[in-house]
């Protein structure tokens, strides 16, 4: 796997302006391998800052309880009518936590919020998107 580069100064400035816009403080994000990782609390602040509502629904055709596979569809909408749909999934292959449905839901919501806020234009992910994105103590 190719090693990620450090975050460049232009990207740092863009992220800083996003962080200020959404009221993010240092506890709401961290850097890991050249990527900004937004915490659950940070995702909630971004959603409020964008006036986004998110609805979640299970996707039966991509869910198999007997195989411990779950898929949740998130639909994010702004007051201006912009809409984004995306998915969050969880299985034994990508989740080591004992509550896979919750993880699928968190991943779906986080992805929808990051997409509708345009933060995915930067090297940004939510901490819920992968176990390896959890902040190292």
Residue ranges and their predicted role:
Residues 1-137:
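Polyanion-binding surfaces on beta-sheet-dominated domains and ring/shell assemblies
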């Amino acid at each position: 796997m190719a090693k990620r580069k450090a975050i460049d100064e232009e990207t740092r400035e863009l992220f800083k302006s996003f962080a200020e816009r959404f009221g993010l403080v240092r506890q709401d994000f961290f850097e890991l391998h050249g990527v900004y990782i937004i915490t659950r609390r940070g995702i909630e602040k971004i959603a409020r800052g964008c006036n986004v509502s998110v609805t979640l629904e299970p996707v039966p055709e991509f869910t198999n309880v007997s195989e411990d596979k779950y898929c949740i569809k998130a639909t994010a909408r702004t007051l201006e009518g912009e809409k984004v749909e995306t998915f969050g999934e969880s299985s034994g292959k990508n989740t080591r936590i004992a509550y896979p449905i919750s993880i699928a839901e968190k991943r779906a919501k986080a992805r929808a919020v990051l997409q509708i806020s345009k933060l995915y234009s930067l090297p940004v992910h939510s901490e819920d998107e992968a176990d390896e994105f959890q902040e190292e103590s």
